[in-house]
Curated annotation (Swiss-Prot):
The gene is rplM. InterPro entries: Ribosomal_uL13 (IPR005822), Ribosomal_uL13_bac-type (IPR005823), Ribosomal_uL13_CS (IPR023563), Ribosomal_uL13_sf (IPR036899). GO terms for biological process: negative regulation of translation; translation. This is Large ribosomal subunit protein uL13. Part of the 50S ribosomal subunit. GO terms for cellular component: cytosolic large ribosomal subunit. PROSITE patterns: RIBOSOMAL_L13.
Length: 144
């Protein structure tokens, strides 16, 4: 008789992946990375455990937005105080913090729960081509 294997955080085999965001479309890249972070690409996916892998994104400043989104897409944030609403276009947000576009897109695709917060910590985004995770020997993850 076959037994159902219950996989938890301790016996999940976490890998490290590196993704080059240069000339990649923001949403398509974010969707793939969110799936890998959640662990949905693994046959042992368990929705109540952190099964996902670690993902390093390089060249985040060179990610593409299609159409007129660079000027027209607006990101809102609120300080919590009256009159504290800030609105920034994607162009302005990219100037202030080049990694924010990718971080916001991927964060929105992961559940907003305690487990989702753990999974978000496995994402490392760098604006340039260099990263500090060479010791983990990350595999390249290709975006189709």
């Amino acid at each position: 008789m076959r037994q159902t294997t219950i996989v938890n955080k301790e016996n999940s085999n976490k890998k490290w992946f590196v993704v080059d965001a240069e000339n990649q479309v923001l949403g398509r890249l974010a969707s793939l990375v969110a799936s890998v972070l959640r662990g949905k690409t693994k046959p042992t996916f368990t929705p109540n455990a952190d099964m996902g892998d670690n993902v390093i994104i390089i060249n985040a400043e060179k990610v593409k937005l299609t159409g007129k989104k660079e000027k027209n897409k607006v990101y809102y944030s609120h300080s919590g105080y009256p009159g504290g609403l800030k609105a920034r276009t994607a162009e302005k947000l990219r100037e202030e913090k080049p990694t924010a576009l990718l971080e916001k897109a991927i964060s929105g695709m992961i559940p907003h729960t305690k487990l989702g917060n753990q999974q978000r910590k496995n994402l490392y985004v760098y604006a340039g081509p260099e990263h500090k995770h060479q010791a983990q020997n990350p595999e390249r993850l290709e975006v189709k």
